[in-house]
Amino acid sequence: MPWIQIKLNATNENAELIGDMLMEETGALSVTFLDAHDTPVFEPLPGETRLWGDTDVLALYDAEADTQLIMSQIKASNMLAEGFAYKIEQLEDKDWEREWMDNFHPMKFGQRLWICPSWRDIPDPTAVNVMLDPGLAFGTGTHPTTALCLEWLESLDLSGKTVIDFGCGSGILAIAAIKLGAEKVIGIDIDPQALLASKDNAQRNGVADQLDVYLPQDQPEGLLADVVVANILAAPLRELSSIIKGLVKPNGQLAMSGVLDTQAEDVANYYRDELHIDPIVEQSEWCRISGRKQG
């Protein structure tokens, strides 16, 4: 069935309160916060909510909702300034999951690595193929940060090496490392759902016995790897820099992404004391920082 969407322009100070009011008083089925100006916002730390200065609040209702009544309730709440901007539109019903699946195609990284949705045919059976079902965790290869890390891994000789995927998400980087020759790979993530998705995808690729996954508090003491990849975000890359550097063996290699071009030099400076940093690689405003740890 079709849906009705009401979009309200708010600020980061009142967006959450407005969202609560829409759910509790107007019967909204869901509420979403979007940036009104496409300004990057960074992943909040646990327990923290971080929104844009100019935020659109999108509320979804069923097609029978009384929009005049809803708008009168919104105005009566006095949460928005007089003359606030809003938009009401009807959305056609779609099979969103099917549409997403139809638009997720096999992708090639470097000379020999393919990331293939599990429901698609493999384009090149002789290549290094990672079959992926993202499930509940982020990481399909479509985002520039994932692509930058995959291309970096593909460029290395991983034969017989140990790799840590710090912030493993769906396990795409960890599984790619195994397929590219790594002997052992460890995935670390703060989200238990990510660990489940990583193990499920590893099983799908026949490499589950080469992948161990841990929550940070459960990882073995003294964990070290020849290669570490951390596709997270700038804030945790800064805050966890000592931990991440400590995972890299002497003469080992590290790559990081989830960093915008405006943040790259600052993040890199947190690692220069222990690593020789390579030239920063940029793709669509996102960057990869890589380097080798001093011996």
Swiss-Prot record:
Root EC class: transferase
InterPro entries found in the cross-reference section: Ribosomal_L11_MeTrfase_PrmA (IPR050078), Ribosomal_PrmA_MeTrfase (IPR004498), SAM-dependent_MTases_sf (IPR029063)
Domain of life, source organism: Bacteria
An annotated GO cellular component: cytosol
Keyword Cytoplasm in annotation: yes
Keywords: Cytoplasm, Methyltransferase, S-adenosyl-L-methionine, Transferase
Residues annotated as binding S-adenosyl-L-methionine: T146, G167, D189, N231
GO MF: protein-lysine N-methyltransferase activity
Biological function: Methylates ribosomal protein L11.
Database matches in PANTHER family: ELECTRON TRANSFER FLAVOPROTEIN BETA SUBUNIT LYSINE METHYLTRANSFERASE
NCBIfam families, per the entry: prmA
The name this protein goes by in its record: Ribosomal protein L11 methyltransferase
